[in-house]
Amino acid sequence: MAQRKIIHVDCDCFYAAVEMRDDPSLRDVPLAVGGEGGRGVVTTCNYRARAFGVRSAMPGSEARRLCPGLVTVPPDMGRYRAVSQQVMAILREMTDLVEPLSLDEAFLDVTDVDAFKGSATLMARHLRERVSREVGITISAGVAPNKFLAKIASDWRKPDGLFVITPPEVADFVSELPVEKLFGVGQVTAARLHALGVKTCGDMQALGADVLIEKFGKQGYRLFEMAHGRDNRPVVVSRVAKSVSVERTFSQDLPDRSACDTVMPALVADLNLRLSRKGQHKPIHKLFVKIRYSDFSTHTLERVRESVTEPALVDFQPLLEELMPKDRPVRLLGVGVRFRNDDAPVTQLRLFD
């Protein structure tokens, strides 16, 4: 079996990049996209703003305290979706095996692509040049033998960077990788690993699978596999699923429900994008909202909404209000749909048709 070649592409500060492209006066100022009111939240920001310490999900008031000259513009999800479609169309000219994760990132499996003499590195370089030239924004790319490593690689030289992990380099690369870089390792899991003396993937390898499974259950085996740089997940163009959802974990807790309201439009837009990418036109049976509070308690509320064909923000707002009757700091927020459980055939459409 041929060694897989996976590319992960991630648009740099996507919403802000689109705003700077369309309004050149914003290119040289610290810029945030998000709610402009006193209780608004930063959805994303450009790198000039990040230099002041501004981050996604940060309350707007704190962002302006850190960066008094911060310019804030409201999000325009329709425009961002259109730009996303341009980017994804370019990716699909390289291969049909494209798995979008959100509006601004995707995996590509280029194992069997003959272009550029089969060099995934040259393919990634070509894609970055095309997106820059034709769309007017930059993307960072990571090339590796699997999805886990490709995603880490794309973040390695952000913004506007390319990083490659070849198969012979995997062992040395992961041995020094901090455990916080592993998918699914948040503050709590990292603290538990640190308590065991595990700071890097090399430490985790030395600890062994048996101890990890004893301490973390099934997650322990997955951690052990990632610590060795192993990930057999395929790039999935479409699949039949019982539900589709998107969620976002915030590096800084959302302070209240008003802040959650600010984040919801982007979540719903990403959900609809994911539904269209998966090409699933099964009847929607339920909508749900998921919240994880700062104390790590997790709550989900779902309601039957069989008349909904394309979920809208207004469909999820009552669920959020009911699930969160009073203000509490929120660590994670998600939205999703469940499909009716029947044997009706699923219509699979080509992406972006």
From Swiss-Prot:
Short name of any one Pfam family annotated for the protein: IMS_HHH_1
EC number: 2.7.7.7
Reaction equations catalysed: DNA(n) + a 2'-deoxyribonucleoside 5'-triphosphate = DNA(n+1) + diphosphate
Superkingdom classification of source: Bacteria
Sites annotated Substrate discrimination: 15
Record localization: Cytoplasm
Keyword set, alphabetical order: Cytoplasm, DNA damage, DNA repair, DNA replication, DNA-binding, DNA-directed DNA polymerase, Magnesium, Metal-binding, Mutator protein, Nucleotidyltransferase, Transferase
Domain UmuC: 6-186
Enzyme class: transferase
Record Gene3D superfamilies: 3.30.70.270, 3.40.1170.60, 5' to 3' exonuclease, C-terminal subdomain (1.10.150.20), DNA polymerase, Y-family, little finger domain (3.30.1490.100)
One GO-annotated biological process of the protein: error-prone translesion synthesis
Gene Ontology terms for molecular function: damaged DNA binding; DNA-directed DNA polymerase activity; magnesium ion binding
Matches recorded under InterPro entries: DNA/RNA_pol_sf, DNA_pol_Y-fam_lit_finger_sf, DNA_pol_Y-fam_little_finger, DNA_polymerase-Y, DNApol_IV, IMS_HHH_1, Rev_trsase/Diguanyl_cyclase, UmuC
One GO cellular component, as annotated: cytosol
Database matches in SUPFAM superfamilies: DNA/RNA polymerases, Lesion bypass DNA polymerase (Y-family), little finger domain
Location of the active site: 105
The family this protein is said to belong to: Belongs to the DNA polymerase type-Y family.
Xref: NCBIfam families: PRK02406.1
The protein's role, per its UniProt record: Poorly processive, error-prone DNA polymerase involved in untargeted mutagenesis. Copies undamaged DNA at stalled replication forks, which arise in vivo from mismatched or misaligned primer ends. These misaligned primers can be extended by PolIV. Exhibits no 3'-5' exonuclease (proofreading) activity. May be involved in translesional synthesis, in conjunction with the beta clamp from PolIII.
Protein's name according to its UniProt entry: DNA polymerase IV
Species of provenance: Marinobacter nauticus (strain ATCC 700491 / DSM 11845 / VT8) (Marinobacter aquaeolei)
